[in-house]
A protein has these predicted regions:
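Asp-based, Mg2+/Mn2+-dependent phosphohydrolase catalytic module
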Residues: 10, 14-124
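Conserved phosphate-coupling serine/threonine residues in phosphotransfer and NTP-handling enzymes
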Residues: 6-8
């Protein structure tokens, strides 16, 4: 099961996900215009965790931005960073469980995590 937690508005998020034919892969979407504070506040992540009734330790966030890493870390959710244009700083390196160079590395990472006995109920 997967969710989207974004600072982007609902209209723009759904437009982009539909255009990319990805919207059907997500069980829940929480957007920046639906929470009181956007990233780096943890509100979007806490909303997803609460709504989907998932333990933070059983969730895993994939993030491409520094503010997103900060938000997930502040929410107490393990985070994997996939740096976009800017490489991870020392702070983000400490706040993440792993840094990968591409989302293509995400599936093998999830397989490795499950093989090692860590069960993530949800990817955000």
């Amino acid at each position: 099961r997967c969710a989207v937690a974004t600072s982007t508005s609902r209209v723009l998020t759904e437009e982009r996900l539909r255009k990319l034919h990805l919207i059907q892969y997500f069980d829940y979407i929480c957007c920046g215009d639906e929470v009181k504070h956007t990233k780096p506040s943890p509100d979007v992540y806490l909303n997803v965790i609460d709504t989907m009734n998932v333990c933070k330790d059983n969730a895993l966030v994939f993030e491409d931005s520094a503010v997103g890493v900060q938000a997930a870390w502040s929410a107490g959710i393990p985070v994997v960073m996939v740096p976009d244009l800017v490489q991870a700083t020392e702070i983000q390196q400490r706040q993440t469980v792993k840094i990968i160079s591409s989302l293509h590395e995400g599936i093998p990472l999830l397989d490795e995590i499950q093989k090692d006995g860590m069960k993530y109920e949800r990817c955000i």
